[in-house]
Structure formats: C-alpha cells, structure tokens
Amino acid sequence: CSSAASDVYKRQRLYRLTKKYGLEISLSATIGKGLYLGHPYNITVASDVIIGDNVNLHKGCTIGRENRGDRAGVPKIGNNVSVGINSTIVGKVNIGNDVMIAPNSFINFDVPDHSVVLGNPAKIHSKEYATKCYVNFLV
C-alpha cells in the first residue's frame, strides 16, 4: 500500500469518526502509545499537538491552539495524563507526567509533574501518583 493510499484511507476514516462521534483529531498531531478515549464524543485535538504515552481523553475535552499572545502555540502533554470530561487545554503549555486534570477545568498554563488540576480558574495541587487508578491500560 503506497503512502498516498494510506493517507487517503486515514483521511476517510477520520472523516467518518468526525461525522459519527464529533471526534476531531488532526492527522498532524503526534500521539504516543496507549491513548484511551473514554466515551469518545466531541473530543478535539488541534494540529501539531504532542500527546505522550498512556493518556486518557474523556468526553468533550479540547486540546487546542492559541493564535496570539505569549502562549501562542499548541499544548505538549506528558505521559500518564488523564484529561477529564469537558476540560480544555489551550496554548503553548506543557503538561507534565502523572497529571490528572479534573472535569470542567480550563488550563492555559504549565502544569508540573505529579499534579492534580481542578477548577475554573484551575488550581494545581501537588500529589504523588496523581493518576493512580485513573489512567487505563498502561503500555
């Protein structure tokens, strides 16, 4: 199978997923092993986003681009991260490893390793093993 045929297949499959589930994941996003989509409806991942290994994305979450200001760019998400329902991560921010982002959180700042982030405006709480029992199917 040629590269062009493979790209056509990927685009057709992505189009079907977008229509059926509202799932919009850019083909230019870099995604590590073990991505888990919990209730995969209305999930958006912008182009050029970097997602590490063992990341859980839940219903309604958005990982998007900021087009202006100090945070212009896309997020980089580390390993073993859980992004809760209806959470939003925007701009050129780094989300560390072992981070749990609670439902309905809005993140537009860097988050260190081993943290739980919750609220809008979001607040960071340091916690060892933050994603224990929250990240599914480690690879």
PLM feature segments, named:
Residues 1-5, 9:
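Single conserved hydrophobic/aromatic residue that forms the stacking wall/gate
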Residues 10-15, 37-38:
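Short juxtamembrane and helix-loop transition motifs at transmembrane-helix boundaries
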Residues 15-23:
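Metal-dependent phosphoesterase signature
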Residues 113-135:
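Conserved beta-strand-loop-alpha-helix hinge in the C-terminal portion
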